[in-house]
């Protein structure tokens, strides 16, 4: 899979504050790539650097294989780091005409196509002040789509929206991916990244915690909890089961972690019995995705 953005060892400080600390990852073409982390984790700073709004103290980034991205390559990138200043009394069409004239991106002929992409074509002549919060944000994304960029960079695209607006924007992001755009978006919402992103990088206090396919990063797991009269003997015979075996001293139990859907309870019970250990407890628990996220960010 081709890479549209490669970030290599990027660091940024503000005085004594280290906003980013040697962050590196690649964004695959055609993905919806989420940069996930709590407030203050460095998400917006990182987007500012790759969009040339901020300068890194260290490291580099490549757009389409070129350091920093040439002016020609930059035309392939649409960006929404903050909401544009639209005129409340003008229509969606007229607001985009002004944006197009100022930015020089695309042509006036592109505006109708952009409005169709963001599902505002039927309201194109309505005044901006009559739009819902979700519609206003869709128009802002439409402004970033002028010139038909290959990549769209969004900073917290659903921030401040009501539930209806959030659903509208998430649906739009998925639709834009299906139309061939690569989406890079910052978010502090685990639920958002789970629902719309194919890949993600998790940041905490400027450090990259993990990156990769969302399904792998946030993989749900089977946790089998066992106990026996002789807990030491149980721990000893279970070392060959699952990918990880832990002793929980507080509960006086042994936990085996399996990939989701692979724990076979009957086999575990039979194995223990065949090895001279009679179980007093055998319980299958599911690790919640939220727990996995907090586990990653708290380690």
Show the residue positions of the predicted features:
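Hydrophobic side chains in well-ordered alpha-helices
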Residues: 73, 110, 213, 233-237, ...
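ABC-family P-loop ATPase nucleotide-binding domain
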Residues: 1-11, 299
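ABC transporter nucleotide-binding domain
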Residues: 170-255, 259
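C-terminal coupling/interaction segments
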Residues: 260-299
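Residue-level "edge-of-site" marker
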Residues: 128, 251, 285
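ABC transporter nucleotide-binding domains
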Residues: 5, 12-185, 190-204, 210
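A short linear hydrophobic-aromatic micro-motif
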Residues: 105, 243-247, 278-282
